[in-house]
Amino acid sequence: MDDIKDMPLHKPVMVEEVLDYLHPQPGHIILDCTVGGGGHAIKILDKIKPDGFLIGIDKDMEILQTTKQSLSKTAGKFKLYHADYSDIDEVLRQADIDKVNGVLLDLGVSSLQFDQADRGFSFAKEAPLDMRMDRSCGITAQNLIRRLSETELAELLWKYGEERRSRRIARAILKEEKGVGITTTRQLAAIVERVVPRGKGKIHPATRVFQALRIAVNKELENLEIFLDKIYNYMAVGARIVIISFH
């Protein structure tokens, strides 16, 4: 198991763009809904100090423990919450905050999570087929596969991964599951690779499959819809929302 405390500081993506569009100012209250390793949060705190306040949310408790140490080294005021951003109303109630001036979401899996082999997000490393961002609750990718029919799995791979060969892949996965069983990342990747040979210069055949399973396991799109329905009730006049997504 890789210890997250020993990993290098997470380098946030599109920092200048985030600061430009979010436009944090001294005294602002900013909501970082996927605070992760704190890369964006540190930059935001520098812009809103001394009287601003940052609320950081993440469903990954393991990352939050390290992030708190990193943010404590700044002069900014902040509070971190172990929660999903779909529970934003409860988080803001606990923080006693009515309105915010800015909101940031960096969707998907972080590089910190990806680099932790035992999390199961990467097929490049042998690991249990987990994929949960919050390992204290929810269903693992391994158990999700066991619960689905061939049709359901194929639909999931198409809906969340836009995988054109979803039915062939689903059939091969469930055949293996009913036989020897599927318990690890590389085992799953090998099954997909047998069905869809890797083309020259193209992404690994299992990329879309892993993406689809991760999105389903963590209910990423459902939680995003819930969040977007709620957040406008807490936006101050002139507030901004910045969402980063790569798929």
Task: Cite the ranges covered by each PLM segment.
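S-adenosyl-L-methionine-dependent methyltransferase catalytic core, i.e., the SAM/SAH-binding region
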Residues: 1-247
